[in-house]
Amino acid sequence: MAKNIQAIRGMNDYLPGETAIWQRIEGTLKNVLGSYGYSEIRLPIVEQTPLFKRAIGEVTDVVEKEMYTFEDRNGDSLTLRPEGTAGCVRAGIEHGLLYNQEQRLWYIGPMFRHERPQKGRYRQFHQLGCEVFGLQGPDIDAELIMLTARWWRALGISEHVTLELNSIGSLEARANYRDALVAFLEQHKEKLDEDCKRRMYTNPLRVLDSKNPEVQALLNDAPALGDYLDEESREHFAGLCKLLESAGIAYTVNQRLVRGLDYYNRTVFEWVTNSLGSQGTVCAGGRYDGLVEQLGGRATPAVGFAMGLERLVLLVQAVNPEFKADPIVDIYLVASGADTQSAAMALAERLRDELQGVKLMTNHGGGNFKKQFARADKWGARVAVVLGESEVTNGTAVVKDLRSGEQTAVAQDSVAAHLRTLLG
């Protein structure tokens, strides 16, 4: 017997029982995006490798350790996208969407990173990202955060996520801070782990993001990034905080929040939770005003975020069990007896025409009434429409409310109207 081929480690199948809740959550997210006037953009899963090296930074965990990179038959180096911002910027430049224009975009789809799989962290994972181009004030930063807060309210998880904010300033401000941080780390080199020693010179701000408790304790005495901010970044951050306070959105300033990708400047933020163990970040983003120019476009202000959908689904299921998937089936059409199947299928098509958006499943594969009603129950149907030989002859159907058990014989021309009343 041939050996079964299984899914790659860390790349999961999502079965019908799971995708139903995903679809409801995604529908909620998309409705909110539409209410803010954001437009969807669809991007390739594979991009040229230099795109990510230039955008994310060569001395980052993503580029050094986590990217799925391969050479195609033409000898070009290609990479499965580890995040969505770089591809979105590339598309904006390539198609002339950015210069002297305002764009508010969102995308959704799989990303790929070669990490150690664990709950909430996978090698293929799904993100929903938003990117705004052409606006540089703190008001658009605030709008993105307000948009995410509206998501949490719609999903019933507001009490289980908290907002952390920081400003990492301009490129010049970070360069000054970098020198001060390196000088401090050199004085305490013996307390650093090997990863931090390596990063101390290649990308010292990443040391601030270390998960090592000893390094975190050491950093309590390190220079504070906030003390090195340029005046424009201070004003921008103060404006953002004021707007969030006016909107009633609570936040904590976390001066060690720097984000894992090199392209950020000024505003950075994360929504975090204590309800998912070690995988606490649900949504994160910030401003990246230099990235468009860095990737070959004209200087364009930009801000955005990405949200991990696997973690969001886990969080909703953990803290809001009342948020359930929409039923797969509203109406189940039962047919039994000689020559009833073609009549049942014809009636089903008429009902689909007249009841837009209603989910109707026709029984196939035969079976007596008892078996067919069991199937209707399995699919979660609220109503059954029943056709037997006498109903076909008389041009009627029996409509049965599967919750109350009440049933009514109705002329086939009136079935749609009767179902509208039953389904509300």
UniProtKB/Swiss-Prot annotation:
Which superkingdom? Bacteria
HAMAP family linked: His_tRNA_synth
Q: Which Pfam families does the annotation name?
A: HGTP_anticodon, tRNA-synt_His
Q: Tell me the GO BP annotations in alphabetical order.
A: histidyl-tRNA aminoacylation
Its encoding gene is what? hisS
Q: Which organism is it from?
A: Shigella boydii serotype 18 (strain CDC 3083-94 / BS512)
How does the annotation summarize its subunit structure? Homodimer.
The top EC class, named as a word, is ligase
A single Gene Ontology CC term: cytoplasm
The answer, when asked if Cytoplasm is one of the entry's keywords, is yes
What is the designated name of this protein? Histidine--tRNA ligase
